[in-house]
Amino acid sequence: MLKNKSVVSIDDVQNDDLFEIFDLSESMLKTIESKGNAPLLTNKIMATLFYEPSTRTRLSFESAMHRLGGSVITVSDTKTSSAAKGETLADTVRMASSYSDIIVIRHPLEGAARLASRFTSKPIINAGDGSGQHPTQTILDLFTIKKELGSIDGKVITMVGDLRYGRTIHSLIIALSRFDVKVNLVSPEILRLPEYVYSMLPDRNYVKEYNDLEEVIGETDVLYVTRIQKERFSDQNEYQSVIGSYSINSETVEKMKKKSVIMHPLPRVDEISPDVDNMPQAAYFRQAYYGVPVRMALIYKILGD
Amino acid sequence: MEEKTLKISKIKDGTVIDHIPSGKALRVLSILGIRDDVDYTVSVGMHVPSSKMEYKDVIKIENRSLDKNELDMISLTAPNATISIIKNYEISEKFKVELPPKLIGIIKCKNQNCITNTREPVKPEFEIVSRHPLVLRCVYCQRTMNERDVFE
């Protein structure tokens, strides 16, 4: 049960909750497309604290709350907030929780959302903490796979790009351990999935590492592409050595199954060529579109009656 | 009986740390902050034959007791160590160190990008993932640390 609970990691969302969110997301999607809004949380206020750049996640959370009839208060720029004066995150969260019913937080440091949840009794939603986790993106990713391909079980998911720092990858691979799937990991040596993430998996048998995408592209049902994140590298020479390692173009897609999808948490830089955008496998903009109904469903599960 | 085989004399008052894995005595001394400026007697036996462990290290410290943090830290490197409190040459209390289910505020997270390594008003907190070999997980950032990470 998610009622009044925080979602800091994907482990905070049990399978029952996950499937209920999927069903509710479908309803929310229909409601958006027919009526625009579902005013179910008219007396609720969401605070958004974004200490790191964000476009999709922030807009989709705020849009979701507005579509639910709630209000949103936000710090538009943390550089102009009390954080710039040296206020701790703990104090900011205490303050924000007295002004709101739920807090959505994105932060460049790992563990920030867990810390926030310790300083308030109000629910905290982790919208990404450093290279840690991004649980709501994972719920959205799983919903997208199910909606696009009919099910998650039985699928081959190939993750490519920045597996070391990619928080969407970390949350997703942990969540996929609950399903009957095969996961292929394709990345440069220095961007391999970290050992600490492996240690969170109940078993490693469903995961296999590859250097070359060609080896697995033909069996792939879901190609999950991630950006190599310049901002996570302390050594820019290391970044220069891996940028452009994998580029998905129309030739790559030709080798994929007809009924397969390409997903990307976005933003992309050059890892997916624009000539892929209009191919039927390109699901990344639809994936972003589902962000609002999925977050509406999650917020309603936490704050609704 | 075993005591007779030790090449370290008995102490009148203080603490004996026994059954330290062979070669770990220096790490235990470091945990206890014992350096060259101590003003009490410390006896260290390294690579001592042992019926239980084949070889072990033993430390005897005169006129000093250990606090909970020190015992928790010792348990990380010597999980089967036994502690004897000595009073007037007799053992007044004897117990095994115990690895607590959570370690709070006694070690730092090795992840420089962990929120606990900032000014925030929280103590670093770790769960035990595995005792042999030692693996700890930061409750905040989820990174794991092994024995070497803890004591480097």
From Swiss-Prot, chain A:
PROSITE patterns: CARBAMOYLTRANSFERASE
InterPro entries to which the protein is assigned, alphabetical: Asp/Orn_carbamoyltranf_P-bd, Asp/Orn_carbamoylTrfase, Asp/Orn_carbamoylTrfase_sf, Asp_carbamoyltransf, Asp_carbamoyltransf_Asp/Orn-bd
Domain of life: Archaea
Record-level GO BP terms: 'de novo' pyrimidine nucleobase biosynthetic process; 'de novo' UMP biosynthetic process; amino acid metabolic process
Residues annotated as binding L-aspartate: 85, 167, 227
Pathway involvement of the protein, from the record: Pyrimidine metabolism; UMP biosynthesis via de novo pathway; (S)-dihydroorotate from bicarbonate: step 2/3
One example GO MF annotation: amino acid binding
EC number(s) stated in the UniProt entry for this protein: 2.1.3.2
Xref: Gene3D superfamilies: Aspartate/ornithine carbamoyltransferase
Catalytic activity, reaction form: carbamoyl phosphate + L-aspartate = N-carbamoyl-L-aspartate + phosphate + H(+)
Binding site for carbamoyl phosphate: 56-57, 106, 134, 137, 266-267
Enzyme class per UniProt: transferase
Keywords: Pyrimidine biosynthesis, Transferase
Family in the record: Belongs to the aspartate/ornithine carbamoyltransferase superfamily. ATCase family.
Matches recorded under PANTHER family: ASPARTATE CARBAMOYLTRANSFERASE, ORNITHINE CARBAMOYLTRANSFERASE, MITOCHONDRIAL
Subunit details: Heterooligomer of catalytic and regulatory chains.
Function (record text): Catalyzes the condensation of carbamoyl phosphate and aspartate to form carbamoyl aspartate and inorganic phosphate, the committed step in the de novo pyrimidine nucleotide biosynthesis pathway.
Protein name: Aspartate carbamoyltransferase catalytic subunit
Organism: Thermoplasma volcanium (strain ATCC 51530 / DSM 4299 / JCM 9571 / NBRC 15438 / GSS1)
Organism taxonomic ancestry: Archaea, Methanobacteriati, Thermoplasmatota, Thermoplasmata, Thermoplasmatales
Swiss-Prot record, chain B:
Record carries keyword NADP: no
Domain of life: Archaea
Keywords of this entry: Metal-binding, Pyrimidine biosynthesis, Zinc
BP GO terms, sorted: 'de novo' pyrimidine nucleobase biosynthetic process; pyrimidine nucleotide biosynthetic process
Cofactor binding remark: Binds 1 zinc ion per subunit.
Names of the cofactor(s): Zn(2+)
Keyword Metal-binding belongs to the record: yes
GO MF annotations in UniProt: metal ion binding
Pfam families named among the record's database cross-references: PyrI, PyrI_C
Gene3D superfamilies reported in the protein's UniProt record: Aspartate carbamoyltransferase regulatory subunit, C-terminal domain, Aspartate carbamoyltransferase regulatory subunit, N-terminal domain
UniProt similarity note: Belongs to the PyrI family.
Function recorded in the entry: Involved in allosteric regulation of aspartate carbamoyltransferase.
Protein name per UniProt: Aspartate carbamoyltransferase regulatory chain
Species this protein is from: Thermoplasma volcanium (strain ATCC 51530 / DSM 4299 / JCM 9571 / NBRC 15438 / GSS1)
